[in-house]
Amino acid sequence: MAEKLIPLEDAQSIVLSHVAPTDLVVIPVWQATGLPLAEDAVADIDISPFANSAMDGYTVRSADLAQASGEAPVTLDVIGHEAAGHVFEGVIGAGETVRIMTGAPVPEGADAVVKYEIVDVLDSDGNEGSRVRFSAPAKVGENVRAAAEEAHAGDVVMRAGEVVAPAGAGLLASAGYASVKVHAAPRVGIISLGTELVAPGELPARGQIRDSNSSALMAETLDAGAEPVFYGIAPDDERAIAELVHRAVQECDFVITSGGASAGDYDYVTALVRREGEVLFDRISMRPGKAITFGLLGGKPYLGLSGNPAAAYVGFEMLARPAIRKMRGFAEGARPVQQAMLTHGVKKRQHRRFFDRATVLRDPETGELLVTEAKTQNSALLGTMQRANCLLRIEEGPCDLKAGDVVDVVRVDLPEGAVL
C-alpha cells in the first residue's frame, strides 16, 4: 500500500492553523528589541517637545543679520547662555543673541542658530556680556530642529506587529514608554527518543550515540523566539515516553520530539498521539524530513521529528519555526527565498521536494549568486548543516539540472522578512 504523503504547503497550513499568538506580557522597552509590538505605540507629547539647536553656536533673529557680510559685519550683544537642561527664560530682541549648546531650546524671539566656528568673539569669553560679530546672513530655521519633528502628541510612532530595533527602543522611550506589551515567549518542550542515545557529556558505548538533536533543537527554538524546555532522553519504552510527553504537554505551549517518527518497531509516540489526541498528518512529500508527525495532544500542538539530524533540522525550519514565530506575534513566517545559479549538475529521481544543504555566494566578478551543494547530503552529518547558509529547494518530480541552471534557495542565514 502506497504511503500517503501530503504536500509541504498543506502541512505548513495545518500547523499554522493550530497555533495562535501567546498571551501578552509587559517588558521594559530595551528588552523588546527584536520583538514585534502587540499594540500601537502612541506619543504622549510632541517629539521633540520644543524647537532646539542642532549645534553649538549663537541663536539669533534672522532679520538682524539680513544685511551681514564680510565687508559690513553685524555685531550683537550676548544676553545669555543656554545649554541642554538649562533654559534661557528671556526673549531675544533686536541686536541681541544667546550662546546656545546643541539640544537646548531655541529662545523666544529667535529663529536661527549660527554655528560657533563662523562667529567672531570680540571680547570676553563669548558668553553673557560679550559682543560677537556675524559676517553672513542666517536663514530662518537654520540649524534649528523643529518642535514635533519626530511626531506630534497622539501620533502612532510604531504599529502593532512592527519589530522593535535598538533605535526603536529609544523612540518608544521618547514617546513615554518605559515598558511595552509583547506576546510571551512560548514554552517549547523538547524530548529526545531512543534507547541508543546518551547525553552529550557521556562517552557512548558500542551501539550508542550522543544526543545531538536536543542541543540543535533547543538552539533553533531559542533562535525562533521561544523558550526551550528540555525533558531529557526517553528510552524505547511506551510508559517512559508517555510520562515525558504528558509532562511536557502540561507545562508547555508546544511539544517537539525527535526520533521515533518512522516505521520502526519501537515508534511509540505516534501511537500515543493517535490514542489520546489527534494525528493530523504523519508523512510529508519532502526530503529530508518525510517522516514527520503533527497532531494535538491535550489541546497542545505536537510535532514529531525524525531522529536524523538533517531531517530534524529541515522539519523544524519548515514547520516549527513558522509556528513559533506566529505564536510570538511575528507577521513574517518564512525565511527569504532567492534565485541562484548552480555551479554543478543535480539529478533527482524521486517525486518528493528536496531541501539540500548548500552554500550560496556572490561571484565577485559577475555579481551573480552561485549555489553549491554540500559534497554529501548524508542526513546524519552535522558539519554540512553548520557550514550551509541555504537550502537548495528542488521542486517535486524527477529532474536533471545542469550547471548554470537557476534554482531557488532558502536563506537560512537570514531572518524572516529580510530584504534581498
Label the model's feature ranges.
Residues 1-8, 178-305, 309-315:
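Helix-rich terminal scaffold detector
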Residues 1-69, 99, 330-355:
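Short, low-complexity N-terminal leaders and the immediately following helix N-cap/first helix
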Residues 2-3, 8, 59-235, 370, ...:
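Short, glycine/charged-enriched hinge/interface segments at domain edges or termini
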Residues 13-24, 38-42, 124, 139, ...:
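Generic secondary-structure signature for well-ordered alpha-helical cores
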Residues 15, 57, 154, 190, ...:
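Residue-level signal for inorganic ion chemistry
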Residues 25-30, 39, 85, 106, ...:
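Flexible glycine/proline-rich
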Residues 51-53, 66-71, 89-93, 106-108, ...:
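Solvent-exposed alpha-helices and their adjacent loops that cap or buttress functional pockets
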